[in-house]
Amino acid sequence: TEHHWDAASGLAPEALRTALLKIEQDMSGQPAIAVKTRLYEKVLASAQLDVDSRDFFPEKLNHDFLLSRIRGRWIVDFRAREMADLLAGTEAATEGLCYTGDADFGHTSPDWQALLTLGIPGLRARLLAARDAKTTLTEEQRLFYACAADTLTATIGFIARLADATDRLAAAGDDKMRLVSSSLRQLTVGAPETLLEAMQLSVIFYNLQCNVERDAVRSLGGLDRQFYPFYRR
């Protein structure tokens, strides 16, 4: 697919790469979950957009898989240190034709029903409610909840960027973009209410998981059952 990146909408990949490497350097020694969250925020807030007036489902970011490349370095290092003995054992078992096994950091199974029922704002609210319901939290748990909430906030911000970009096309007289923008705007404040909004949210969420974070989403299916309630409305 040919992309038409809006140069005024954000940083080109090389400038984005410089910004991400600085974040990584400045946060050296901090937990990986904290560093990754800040990197994710920067990509979603700053990468260039491609919003096409022919497209009902804008979601494109000019990020050059930079977050994935950085994370890939971490995984190589982790395999060489913490997992070295374990992986040596699985390699021997593989060579002996006992079984095949390897480290896997990249498969997720999102709860699509929860996503479509709650939306990103609802998922964030549920997360914070779960945190607040706990009487005591370790520092590790506090960090997890904070990073998860920040990740969802960044996702809402990205959808708002898409809504702003489609707003500009709508202002030029494009009625289709007016509909697209209105639907995207709904996703920044609540759950999807229409079929278009449900489809938009699914496309955006899938893209962010698979292309920005580079996780292999293994639970996208049953779209007839997922979308049918919205179709009936």
Q: Where are the model-predicted features located?
A:
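Long, non-catalytic protein-protein interaction scaffolds
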Residues: 1-131, 135
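Structured, charged N-terminal subsegments at the starts of enzyme catalytic cores
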Residues: 124-233
